[in-house]
C-alpha cells in the first residue's frame, strides 16, 4: 500500500513556508476565495514527485515582484510509505538552502529510501526510479488521483494516451506478449504448412514422371 504522509514546502509559487500532514485520521477541507492558493498546495505535491505542476509547468519559483527579501528558492520535501519502507523525495529549484548533506539545493532531485540516498545518476533515471517506486506515471497520477479545475480528464486524452494509461493501470503488457507469441506460433505453422505443400507438389511431380516412364 502506498501512503503519502507529510509534505514540507518552501518558496513554491505563492507558498512561503508550509508543513502539512497528508495522511490525517480525518478529512481535511481547505476553504479560501479563488486565487488564494488552495490548488497550489496540491501542485507542490505533484511538482515534488514529477518535476512539473498540475498544469505540466516545471518553473515554480515565486514571482520576483512578490518575493520576500530572504527568498532562497524552491524546496519541496514529500514523505511516503510503501510496504515497510519509508521514502523521501526532495526537489529543489534555484535553491540556496543548505540540505542535510551540506550542499545547497540548487536544482537537485534526491530520493531517499529508509534514510539512505538512492544512488541513481542523472535526473531522468532518478525520475524513472521514483515512478517505479510509486507505480504511477505523471499522466496516470493526474488522471487517477488529481482532479482539479482546468485539468485534462481521461476522456479528453488522445486514443494513444488512453491506451498507455489503461496499459499502466491494468498491466496489459502481458496481452502484447501473448499476441507476439501467438503471432510467432502462427508464422511457424504457416511455414510448416508451406513446406508440406511444397513436398506434396514434389511428390506429385515425381508420381506423374513415374507414370509417364511406364
Where are these regions (language model features)?
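Extended, Lys/Glu-rich alpha-helical coiled-coil stalks
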Residues: 29, 143-214
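Conserved, well-folded catalytic cores of nucleic-acid-processing
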Residues: 48-52, 133-136, 168-172
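Extreme N-terminal "head/tail" segments of very large remodeling/mechanoenzyme assemblies
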Residues: 1-117
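Generic structural "secondary-structure junction" signal
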Residues: 14-17, 65-68, 136, 149, ...
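Flexible, charged interface-and-hinge segments in very large macromolecular machines
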Residues: 78-82, 123-151
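Alpha-helical structural motif
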Residues: 41, 72, 122-126, 137, ...
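A short, sequence-level motif marking secondary-structure junctions
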Residues: 92-97, 122-128
Amino acid at each position: 500500500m502506498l501512503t503519502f504522509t507529510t509534505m514540507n514546502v518552501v518558496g513554491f509559487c505563492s507558498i512561503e513556508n508550509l508543513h502539512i500532514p497528508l495522511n490525517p485520521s480525518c478529512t481535511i477541507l481547505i476553504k479560501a476565495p479563488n486565487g488564494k492558493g488552495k490548488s497550489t498546495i496540491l501542485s507542490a505535491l505533484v511538482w515534488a514527485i514529477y518535476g512539473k505542476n498540475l498544469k505540466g509547468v516545471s518553473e515554480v519559483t515565486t514571482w520576483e515582484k512578490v518575493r520576500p527579501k530572504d527568498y532562497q528558492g524552491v524546496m519541496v520535501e514529500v514523505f511516503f510509505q510503501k510496504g515497510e519502507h519509508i521514502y523521501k523525495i526532495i526537489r529543489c529549484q534555484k535553491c540556496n538552502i543548505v540540505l542535510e548533506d551540506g550542499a545547497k539545493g540548487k536544482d537537485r532531485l534526491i530520493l531517499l529510501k529508509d534514510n539512505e540516498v538512492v544512488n541513481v545518476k542523472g535526473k531522468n533515471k532518478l525520475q524513472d526510479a521514483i515512478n517505479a517506486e510509486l507505480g504511477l506515471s505523471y499522466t496516470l497520477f493526474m488522471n487517477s488521483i488529481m482532479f482539479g479545475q482546468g485539468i485534462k480528464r481521461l476522456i479528453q486524452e488522445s486514443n494513444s494516451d488512453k491506451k498507455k494509461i489503461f496499459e499502466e493501470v491494468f498491466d496489459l503488457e502481458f496481452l502484447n506478449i501473448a499476441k507476439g507469441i501467438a503471432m510467432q506460433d502462427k508464422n511457424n505453422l504457416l511455414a510448416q504448412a508451406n513446406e508440406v505443400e511444397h513436398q506434396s507438389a514434389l511428390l506429385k511431380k515425381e508420381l506423374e514422371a513415374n507414370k509417364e516412364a511406364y
